[in-house]
Design a protein with these regions (language model features):
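Bacterial N-terminal signal peptides
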Residues: 6-15
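Short, cationic interaction patches enriched in Lys/Arg with P/S/T/G and frequent prolines
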Residues: 17-119, 124-128
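Surface-exposed, glycine-biased beta-strand/turn segments
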Residues: 104-212
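Acidic, glycine-rich catalytic/binding loops that coordinate metals and/or anionic ligands
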Residues: 145-164, 170, 174, 185, ...
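Active-site region of chymotrypsin-like
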Residues: 176, 213-240
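Active-site loop architecture of trypsin-fold serine endopeptidases
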Residues: 204-211, 253-265
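Short hydrophobic beta/alpha edge segments that flank linear recognition/processing sites
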Residues: 215-216, 244-257
Length: 298
């Protein structure tokens, strides 16, 4: 069979919509790996990890400028995308200028703003506070304008192995409406929509440390983002800060990260208020699903 993922997907049974499936990984004497929903001797539970793990703490930073009058708090956004932030000050003591409620703002790409300046009420005593910064990529004020997407690959036809509300792994807010499409490693992946490349990962091999594997995130003009996951190591051909058109080559499909077989995981997300969530979309062309596979509930 051409794809191990095909074997895995065909063995899944339809469960209740709210329940997640338990998947087992079995390696036989010849080293052949099989995924199944049956607990056979020697099989191990396949542990699902959230596919979308993106560290932004090196690109969205809270900075403190100390001066004779006190402290000035600034936030810097080094991303090529807007970022919504929320700053809360806790355990405050001997401070003037503390906001009465959390400060929220949407920082433009590649920008820095001042959020607050604090001074000591009693200059002979230290100024004390604990800042808590929350943030999420994207501008929640923007609304989606497109739901139908061209196929983000060349070749095929390929088959859908897990769709919206799929019970294996499409049950988190970030991935509920994602699509998994089985395809050979090295299949050309293209941008379903044009926009700005805002995040990439290109160096991961195998399962690695990031469940997303290698990926590309593209910000569209309506604030939504298309994300392409589990890409082949070294195949990402776009860079952060590059504007691309619909249909532009971006990478080749792979089997990296939290992947059970060669496939593309494609999801559209938007910031819904300090959190990224997936949103419904359709492919502009029909994509058949594998037989006997739970592609999700309504």
């Amino acid at each position: 069979m051409p794809f191990r993922l095909t074997v895995f997907c065909a063995l899944l049974l339809v469960a209740s919509q709210a329940a997640a499936l338990t998947i087992y990984k079995y390696t036989d004497a010849n080293g052949v790996v099989t995924y199944t929903d049956q607990a056979t001797a020697g099989a191990q539970v396949f542990v699902f990890r959230d596919r979308m793990v993106e560290r932004l703490d090196n690109q969205v930073k809270l900075e403190t400028q100390k001066h004779a009058a006190g402290d000035t708090l600034l936030v810097r956004n080094d991303l090529y995308a807007p970022v919504q932030i929320e700053l809360t000050l806790e355990q405050v003591d001997n401070a003037i200028g503390v906001p009465s409620k959390p400060i929220t703002w949407v920082l433009p790409p590649r920008s820095k703003i001042r959020l607050a300046t604090l001074t000591a009420r009693d200059a002979s005593k230290p100024l004390r506070y604990t800042p808590k910064l929350r943030y999420a990529m994207g501008d929640p004020r923007l609304l989606p304008t497109q739901q139908s997407y061209p196929l983000p690959w060349r070749g095929g036809p390929f088959r859908l192995t897990q769709g919206a509300n799929g019970q294996y792994s499409h049950f988190t807010p970030k991935g509920r409406y994602a699509m998994d499409i089985a395809m050979p490693e090295g299949t050309p992946i293209v941008a379903a929509r044009g926009g700005m490349v805002v995040k990439t990962e290109n160096q991961q091999s195998g399962r690695g440390t990031n469940p997303s594997g290698n990926y590309v995130r593209i910000l569209h003009d309506d604030g939504t983002m298309g994300v392409y996951l589990h890409l082949m190591q070294g195949s990402v051909s776009v860079r952060e800060g590059q504007r691309i058109n619909s249909g532009s080559p971006i990478a080749r499909s792979g089997n990296t990260g939290n992947s059970t077989g060669p496939h593309l995981h494609f999801v559209v997300q938007r910031n819904v208020g300090l959190a990224l969530e997936s949103i419904p979309f359709d492919f502009a062309q029909p994509v058949n699903s594998l037989p006997n596979f739970a592609v999700g509930g309504e």
